[in-house]
Swiss-Prot record:
Function description: Catalyzes the rearrangement of 1-deoxy-D-xylulose 5-phosphate (DXP) to produce the thiazole phosphate moiety of thiamine. Sulfur is provided by the thiocarboxylate moiety of the carrier protein ThiS. In vitro, sulfur can be provided by H(2)S.
Gene expressing this chain: thiG
Organism from which the protein derives: Prochlorococcus marinus (strain NATL2A)
Protein name (record): Thiazole synthase
Matches recorded under Pfam families: ThiG
EC number(s) on file: 2.8.1.10
Compositionally biased region (Polar residues): 255-268
GO cellular component terms, A-Z: cytoplasm
Length: 268
C-alpha cells in the first residue's frame, strides 16, 4: 500500500521528521546533544533500564535532552522475556511523565533473549505487545523482518512495526530487503526500519523502498564525526522520502537512449 502522508503518524501523534534516533554509545553528552540537533529528529529513544541504572553514558542523559521539543520513546532494551519487558514499559511511562510528557504512552518494545546477534524473540514480543496494547500503550515492537509476525502485531493493535535491517550495531545495512518489501506492501501501519543501518545511503534506501521512517543509533554515535554524520542521515532520510514520493523509474533489462533516435541523420 503506497503511503503518501506528509507526516509520520504514530498512534495519534504526528511528526515531521522520519528519522528516529538512539542515545547510546556517544563519546559524551555534549556530542550527543549536538548530534541530536543535527538529525532534526523529533523522537528519541532511551533505554529505561540503562537510564535508571545510571549506566555508562546514561548519567545526566535525561537532563540533557529538551523534552519539550523531543518526544520520548522509552525502550525495553535489556529485557529477555515478555514479563520483564512489560515491567520496564510501565517504568518507561513513568519516566516520560517525569520528563513532563504526561500523555506519552509510547514504548519501543524489545524482547531480546539472544546476546550474540541481539535478535528479537517473536513469541515473547507478541505476548508482551498484547498485554501492553491492553494497558493502553502505543506499542512500537522491534522485530525480525518476518511479514507474518508483522501482520500479527498489526492485528493486535500495535502502532508500528520496526523490522531490523541487520543486527543491532552491526552496520551491515539492509540485508533482508525482499522481506522488508513484503512487510511494507502488506501493512496499514507505519514501518520503521530499526537497527543495522551503517551509512546514510542505506537510510535513503529504506525510505525509497516505502518505509515510513528509520531508527539510527550506532552509525551516528560511533562515526568519526557524529555531528556531521547526524546531518548526513537527516538529509538522506529526507532525500529517500522524496525519492519514494516521486515514483521511481522502473528497472528495465534493456538500454534506452537518452536522446530520441528519430530524425537522426543516417550514415547510409
Ligand atoms: C537504540 C536502539 O533502540 C537500538 O537498539 C536500535 O535498534 C538501533 O540500532 P543501531 O545501533 O544498529 O542503529
Amino acid at each position: 500500500m503506497q503511503k503518501t502522508n506528509k507526516f509520520l503518524k504514530i498512534g495519534n501523534k504526528e511528526f515531521k521528521s522520519r528519522l528516529l534516533v538512539g542515545t547510546g554509545k556517544y563519546s559524551s553528552l555534549e556530542v550527543m546533544q549536538k548530534s541530536l540537533i543535527n538529525t532534526k529528529c523529533e523522537i528519541v529513544t532511551v533505554a529505561v533500564r540503562r537510564v535508571q541504572g545510571l549506566e555508562h553514558g546514561h548519567k545526566g542523559l535525561m537532563e540533557s535532552i529538551d523534552w519539550k521539543r523531543i518526544w520520548m520513546l522509552p525502550n525495553t532494551a535489556g529485557c529477555s522475556n515478555a514479563e520483564e519487558a512489560i515491567r520496564i514499559a510501565r517504568l518507561g511511562r513513568e519516566l516520560a511523565k517525569l520528563a513532563g510528557q504526561e500523555t506519552n504512552n509510547f514504548v519501543k518494545l524489545e524482547v531480546i533473549p539472544d546476546k550474540k546477534y541481539l535478535l528479537p524473540d517473536p513469541i515473547g514480543t507478541l505476548k508482551a505487545a498484547e498485554q501492553l496494547v491492553k494497558e493502553g500503550f502505543t506499542v512500537l515492537p522491534y522485530i525480525n523482518s518476518d511479514p507474518l509476525i508483522a501482520k500479527q502485531l498489526e492485528e493486535i493493535g500495535c502502532a508500528t512495526v520496526m523490522p531490523l535491517g541487520s543486527p543491532i550495531g552491526s552496520a551491515q545495512g539492509i540485508r533482508n530487503a525482499a522481506n522488508i518489501a513484503m512487510i511494507i506492501a502488506e501493512s496499514r501501519i507505519p514501518i520503521i526500519i530499526d537497527a543495522g543501518i551503517g551509512v546514510p545511503s542505506e537510510a535513503a534506501q529504506a525510505l525509497e523502498m516505502g518505509a515510513d521512517g528509520v531508527l539510527i543509533n550506532s552509525a551516528i554515535a560511533l562515526a568519526e564525526n557524529p555531528i556531521l554524520m547526524a546531518q548526513a542521515f537527516s538529509k538522506a532520510t529526507e532525500a529517500g522520502r522524496d525519492g519514494y514520493l516521486s515514483g521511481r523509474l522502473k528497472e528495465n533489462p534493456l538500454a534506452s537512449p537518452s536522446s530520441p533516435l528519430d530524425g537522426v541523420i543516417s550514415n547510409n
